[in-house]
Amino acid sequence: MVTYDELNEQNDKITELTNVLEHLLGDRHLCGSAVTCELFYRFVEEVKNHLEVMDKGLYSQLLTHQERQVRNTADRFMGGSKEIKRIFAAYLKKWCRPKTRELAIKEYDQFMAETEDMFELVLNRIQAEQENLYPMIRKVTGDPQRAVA
């Protein structure tokens, strides 16, 4: 069972980490600090976990719904999830050293541009979930508290 409170809590954590990381990574001297790297990898884990919860639980009930609009919305969000995962994986491969949990920043300006794009992508996704997906699921299921039974 997944509740809207749990999904919103995940989204709040991701948003908070994004906001903090934007400030820390904005200072070139703090990019390689242990604290920044720890928060960055926590952000990565939170995003991956959230997408996994969404992929495994929410879409199946929507994809079989009788209304085409519901199925199309679920399909769009699933496609968006795949695209975010693809972009995220390429970003992590380029800028991260997962074994040592460090950032591999060779070109700071390029790193920051790609990081800001990635943060924007994730935050836009969260906003779309809260404004479009969750209300639709509430309407379809009639359950104001549980997104997935």
Kindly give the residue locations of the regions a language model identified.
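Small-residue-biased structural context
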Residues: 1-149
